[in-house]
């Protein structure tokens, strides 16, 4: 597949997602980094977003709850280039009924080459990057060329 460049803006659009057993871990991480995160636009699946907003007073664009379609909503935003970073604390020890949605979300984040953290250490590396508050170029699939090739 041919690639093109997308510029992640200095003010990132960040999606926050956490499975039930990981919600407290994500909330603690958000509270620890609240001053930095408040400089960006935040999205989250429903329950996670409402819990974070209630605990911190931060403005969160809450989707539906993950099992009710929220993971797919976040995935759609990634596909549309509207999410720049995904912080997704998923529980590797417990299966969830919407596992296919979880896999699809992670697949789309990989396809569209956005930074993804699935644990605290990686989330810390991302947010502490000297480029976190900078505009950064990434390579993404050239969808227009892909579509043109498919329609030949």
Curated annotation (Swiss-Prot):
SUPFAM superfamilies: Methylglyoxal synthase-like. Catalyzes the formation of methylglyoxal from dihydroxyacetone phosphate. One of its GO terms (molecular function) is methylglyoxal synthase activity. It is an enzyme of class 4 (lyase). Keywords: Lyase. This is Methylglyoxal synthase. InterPro entries: Methylgl_synth, Methylglyoxal_synth_AS, MGS-like_dom, MGS-like_dom_sf. It comes from Escherichia coli (strain 55989 / EAEC).
């Amino acid at each position: 597949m041919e690639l093109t460049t997308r510029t992640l803006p200095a003010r990132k659009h960040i999606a926050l997602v956490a499975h039930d057993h990981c919600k407290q871990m994500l909330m603690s991480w958000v509270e620890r980094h609240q001053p930095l995160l408040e400089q960006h636009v935040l999205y989250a699946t429903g329950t996670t977003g409402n819990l974070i907003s209630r605990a911190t007073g931060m403005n969160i664009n809450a989707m539906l709850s993950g099992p009710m379609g929220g993971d797919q909503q976040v995935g759609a935003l990634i596909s549309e280039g509207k999410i720049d970073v995904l912080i997704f604390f998923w529980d590797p020890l417990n299966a969830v009924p919407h596992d296919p949605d979880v896999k699809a979300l992670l697949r789309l984040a990989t396809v569209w080459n956005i930074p993804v953290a699935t644990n605290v250490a990686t989330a810390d590396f991302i947010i502490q990057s000297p480029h976190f508050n900078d505009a950064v170029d990434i390579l993404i699939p050239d969808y227009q060329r892909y579509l043109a090739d498919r329609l030949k």
